[in-house]
Amino acid sequence: MSEDSFLKYFANGVEPKKAAVLYAVQEPTAVSLFAGRTTQAAWRSKPSWYAVSKQDQTINPDLERFLAKRMNATTVELDAGHLSLVSHPKEVADLILAAAGHKE
């Protein structure tokens, strides 16, 4: 991915200097990541949580909403781009803490 595309589509919403550093240190995805086969989706039998990034330019937010609804996930919507973990750490941490405190 070009630096321009990374900054515009992948890291939109991230402070520009931080986004430039993220671009500089990224590495190619390991091909082995795509070699494995998933045999069972955990969301079919486990409670799930999902953060929809409303400004995501990498994954369409409508697709994110569809996936969250399909898995019956507890969902929050963030005014964030694809890297909501970086641009909205408190909101993402709150979602993780809610999931961690959930009793089945």
For the regions a language model picked out, list residue spans one by one:
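Conserved loop-alpha-helix segment in the C-terminal half of the alpha/beta-hydrolase fold
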Residues: 54-79, 99
